């Protein structure tokens, strides 16, 4: 399954497999986000899918790090697994990592987010906070937290189920924080 968005002339496609990445690349995608289980909102892809995609496609590949569906508040074991997944994916050529950590009260989990961003940036890659952002209680506060933590990009539909429904909030966030962080549609 392939879903796409256009960001200021940049076509990014959300892909669920190596085959999807190859199809997106052959059809003009500028960048892809590699996942598995898109029907669950996207989960961590296998390292083999990333390796095959990097060997055969010449576009940037952002990989999702998410161990399960069902929310963005993780146990310590899940969190440690996510850091290891990110490290392995970066070692195998991921151009960035899409991730999201929330607290039980629907705020950005600052410590975990900072540690993940530091790991990603230590590899010189892009830190993308994914649609966990759509579950936060206070979006402006969340954007400011992500800016202060050093996130490079936020994927959001403005807190709504889809971009069209959240377009007013999305446009507000984009205009308010345009010079500080890239906020894009999933």
Predicted segment positions?
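Conserved, mostly hydrophobic/aromatic
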Residues: 24, 89, 130, 154
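Active-site mouth loops of central-metabolism enzymes
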Residues: 6-16, 67-81, 128-138
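Glycine/small-residue-rich loop that forms an oxyanion/phosphate-binding "nest" at active or ligand-binding sites
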Residues: 60-110
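Short, acidic/polar
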Residues: 16-23, 78-88, 137-144
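Active-site-adjacent beta->alpha loops and helix N-cap segments on the catalytic face
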Residues: 39-57, 103-119, 136-141, 161-174
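Residue-level detector of conserved catalytic or cofactor/ligand-binding positions
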Residues: 181-186
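Conserved beta-strand positions in the central sheet of alpha/beta enzyme cores
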Residues: 12-14, 31-33, 62, 98, ...
